[in-house]
């Protein structure tokens, strides 16, 4: 008898195979999950202990610190935003090839840049170089601020003057040169120089002629041409009239005081209505007034030591003490003593009060010779030049005379002015004495002084034609 084996049904076999496949998939998924867990566990820092783990943690920690100090590069926009938070001025070193825009704000005076202006300049290597700001005030010198300043240059080619604004500090540079070269140049001559322009024709205003020639009876013809503006020099100096005529054209181009007077602008309403600086006259006050300049008219002062100085005194200016050396013009005191008896003497200078007032306190402490003193603040500043407008005196101009070594100083009252040679050191000078007879005669006439001064000195004939 044979035994017959029974075969399984196909459904059952398929089911076993399915169960087997499902088990395999389950095991494979479990294996994958275990592997993923192992990978994640490897990524997580292990809590190890001991010396070895401490060293590992130290090494890992230093590496992370370096990564923090050197982060990944960011975009230029992000970097610039962070830099702007640090400083208000963006760096220009990152972009040296890009030009820097220059913005300049023009002022209202001659177009000069007096307002904001970029104070840095780009070098060739792309770096910035600091430049001084144009808004800083100009440098000034002691000589230009204390003593009478030199007038700014005027010429036919420069009708508006050099300054272009009512700034009194712009003639300071020339004043310093004149004062510094004063002793070096003047000491070479044995006689006095007529004006600053004789020794320094490019720096100051020469007087057309000396008062001595007028007082000796020499009168100019109104029909002849304007003479050279070089002051007459003594024969000992070695200069001839031909040399003066040759230098006339050059002097005209450099400076012409009468061209300045011809083109000086008229006084404004505010200047015309200024309150008089002097008190009213009293019964004891003389009827006529004589206005006198100080520097190079009555005295010559210097900050350099002068061996023949008549006196010296200190001046405190801007917290610094300076020593001033003074020479007195010959017959200075005799002239004042005589004129103070018949005139109301008024000192009118373009110098600073801190210097001039102290000098007068030494020369005339009781104000017996000079009744009143006026200083730079009483002058009218026109295009950087100080002009002595006699209207501020509050006196009758028909009985007022001014003596000054610079005719520009009395440009608004030319008929009231008597020019005099500038004095520096000549011990034989007699210009003050020569004026005494004429001044005494004006008082005796008791008339309007202006026609007599005009006929005697003829300054109007020196003005250029229209």
Swiss-Prot record:
Alphabetized UniProt keyword annotations: Hydrolase, Protein phosphatase
Compositionally biased residues, Polar residues: 50-62
UniProt xrefs under InterPro entries: Dullard_phosphatase, FCP1_dom, HAD-like_sf, HAD_sf, TIM50
Molecular function GO terms recorded: phosphoprotein phosphatase activity
Enzyme class: hydrolase
UniProt xrefs under Pfam families: NIF
Biased composition (Acidic residues): 30-39
EC number(s) reported in the record: 3.1.3.-
Domain named FCP1 homology: residues: 283-442
SUPFAM superfamilies associated with the record: HAD-like
SMART domains in the record: CPDc (SM00577)
Disordered, as annotated region: 1-136, 211-238
NCBIfam families per UniProt: HIF-SF_euk
Protein family: Belongs to the CTDSPL2 family.
Function: Probable phosphatase.
Protein name per UniProt: CTD small phosphatase-like protein 2
Native organism taxonomy: Eukaryota, Metazoa, Chordata, Craniata, Vertebrata
Gene: ctdspl2
């Amino acid at each position: 008898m044979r035994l017959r084996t029974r075969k399984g049904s196909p459904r059952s076999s398929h089911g076993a195979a399915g169960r087997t496949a499902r088990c395999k998939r389950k095991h494979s998924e479990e294996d994958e999950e275990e592997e993923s867990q192992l990978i994640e566990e490897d990524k997580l820092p292990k809590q190890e202990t001991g010396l070895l783990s401490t060293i590992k943690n130290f090494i890992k920690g230093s590496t992370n610190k370096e990564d923090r100090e050197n982060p990944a590069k960011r975009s230029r926009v992000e970097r610039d935003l962070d830099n702007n938070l640090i400083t208000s001025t963006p760096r220009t070193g990152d972009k040296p090839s890009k030009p820097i825009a220059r913005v300049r704000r023009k002022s209202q005076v001659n177009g000069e840049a007096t307002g904001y202006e970029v104070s840095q300049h780009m070098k060739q290597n792309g770096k910035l170089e600091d430049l001084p700001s144009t808004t800083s005030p100009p440098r000034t010198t002691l000589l230009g601020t204390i003593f009478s300043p030199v007038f700014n240059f005027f010429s036919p080619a420069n009708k508006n003057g050099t300054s272009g604004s009512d700034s009194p500090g712009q003639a300071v540079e020339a004043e310093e040169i004149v004062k510094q070269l004063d002793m070096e140049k003047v000491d070479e001559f044995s006689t006095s120089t007529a004006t600053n322009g004789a020794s320094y024709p490019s720096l100051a205003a020469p007087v057309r002629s000396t008062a001595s020639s007028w007082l000796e009876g020499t009168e100019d013809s109104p029909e002849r041409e304007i003479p050279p503006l070089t002051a007459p020099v003594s024969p000992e100096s070695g200069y001839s009239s031909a040399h003066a005529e040759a230098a006339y054209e050059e002097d005209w181009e450099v400076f012409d005081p009468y061209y300045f007077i011809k083109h000086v602008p008229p006084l404004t309403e505010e200047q015309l209505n200024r309150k008089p600086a002097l008190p009213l006259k009293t019964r004891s006050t003389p009827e006529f007034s004589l206005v006198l300049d100080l520097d190079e008219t009555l005295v010559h002062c210097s900050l350099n030591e002068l061996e023949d100085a008549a006196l010296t005194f200190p001046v405190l200016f801007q917290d610094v003490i300076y020593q001033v050396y003074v020479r007195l013009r010959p017959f200075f005191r005799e002239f004042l003593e005589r004129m103070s008896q018949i005139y109301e003497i008024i000192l009118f200078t373009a110098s600073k009060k801190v210097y001039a007032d102290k000098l007068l306190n030494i020369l005339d402490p009781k104000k017996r010779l000079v009744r009143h003193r006026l200083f730079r603040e009483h002058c009218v500043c026109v295009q950087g030049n100080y002009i002595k407008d006699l209207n501020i005196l509050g006196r009758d101009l028909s009985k007022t005379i001014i003596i000054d070594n610079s005719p520009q100083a009395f440009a608004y009252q030319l008929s009231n002015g008597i020019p005099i040679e500038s004095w520096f050191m000549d011990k034989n000078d007699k210009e003050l004495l020569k004026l005494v007879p004429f001044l005494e005669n004006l008082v005796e006439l008791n008339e309007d002084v202006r026609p007599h001064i005009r006929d005697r000195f003829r300054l109007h004939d020196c003005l250029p034609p229209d």
